[in-house]
């Protein structure tokens, strides 16, 4: 059966609005959730919990993209990189975007309802963080830090779902994830810095100014120190350390990429964070597997 072209076009617009054509954002959300899942489950996470966390991450990342484009609908047409986004280009209306956002959030909440009460309770501030983040760039130069709070919220939820509690190590991992989001989203904001200044959007890339590379470097060191401290606290071994060493290598490579602040290379540095997250998870996975 042939699908009408208009239906295909609409489906494609919704697909792009949810950024399913650009899965990097899913991975940046998913890796910390998987770190938490493996630590909370001591290398043997509950399959049901794992499924809810993974699908929940995918749904809420899509919801976050939709509400972000809704919030930025007046700005996106004036930025070269975002002017062809579905709402900015008139392919999807604001009303349709809000309906899609609600459907995605309700679907994710339906998944959470299969978990314990602590996880359900934690989903409320999580939804608030996701929905409010896009509006912060109007009022503060720290929207990237707020994004970290939103992206990292999967960590306490994962510990709650897996163990029924949120131990100190969960909050340490949350802190590392907030720093990580601050790092990679600042790299992302460096791409749009000139356009953002013109239209009045705030970001850490603008706030940090000529010290952006140095501050990113300090944040990278702090994040790696927290991750190393978590490994020591949990008694993890050499394989985890090897994963962290690989992650540190990716951090150095990212510094090389952003050295001249070229837009294309700043964007490559942002994308490279996928491999940072993968390296940390590989170290965790291998260490728990080796320990049996």
UniProtKB/Swiss-Prot annotation:
GO cellular component entries: plasma membrane
Task: Enumerate the Pfam families for this protein.
Answer: UbiA
- Gene Ontology BP, a term: ubiquinone biosynthetic process
First-level EC class: transferase
Named cofactor requirement(s): Mg(2+)
Report the GO molecular function annotations: 4-hydroxybenzoate polyprenyltransferase activity
The membrane topology noted for this protein in its Swiss-Prot or TrEMBL record is:
Multi-pass membrane protein
Please write the reaction equations for the catalytic activity of this protein.
Answer: all-trans-octaprenyl diphosphate + 4-hydroxybenzoate = 4-hydroxy-3-(all-trans-octaprenyl)benzoate + diphosphate
Q: What is the first-listed, main subcellular location in coarse terms?
A: membrane
This enzyme's EC code(s)? 2.5.1.39
Query: What does the record give as its pathway?
Result: Cofactor biosynthesis; ubiquinone biosynthesis
**Compartments where located:** Cell inner membrane
What keywords are assigned to this protein? Cell inner membrane, Cell membrane, Magnesium, Membrane, Transferase, Transmembrane, Transmembrane helix, Ubiquinone biosynthesis
PROSITE patterns documented for this protein: UBIA
Endpoints of the signal sequence:
none
Check the record and name the InterPro entries matching this protein.
Answer: HB_polyprenyltransferase-like, Prenyltransferase, UbiA_prenyltransferase, UbiA_prenylTrfase_CS, UbiA_sf
The regions listed as transmembrane in this protein's record are 23-43, 47-67, 98-118, 141-161, 164-184, 211-231, 233-253, 270-290
Tell me its family.
Answer: Belongs to the UbiA prenyltransferase family.
Q: What does it do? A: Catalyzes the prenylation of para-hydroxybenzoate (PHB) with an all-trans polyprenyl group. Mediates the second step in the final reaction sequence of ubiquinone-8 (UQ-8) biosynthesis, which is the condensation of the polyisoprenoid side chain with PHB, generating the first membrane-bound Q intermediate 3-octaprenyl-4-hydroxybenzoate.
Q: Which PANTHER family match?
A: 4-HYDROXYBENZOATE POLYPRENYLTRANSFERASE, MITOCHONDRIAL, PRENYLTRANSFERASES
State what protein this is by name.
Answer: 4-hydroxybenzoate octaprenyltransferase
What organism is listed for this UniProt entry? Methylococcus capsulatus (strain ATCC 33009 / NCIMB 11132 / Bath)
- Upper classification of the organism: Bacteria, Pseudomonadati, Pseudomonadota, Gammaproteobacteria, Methylococcales
| Record gene name | ubiA
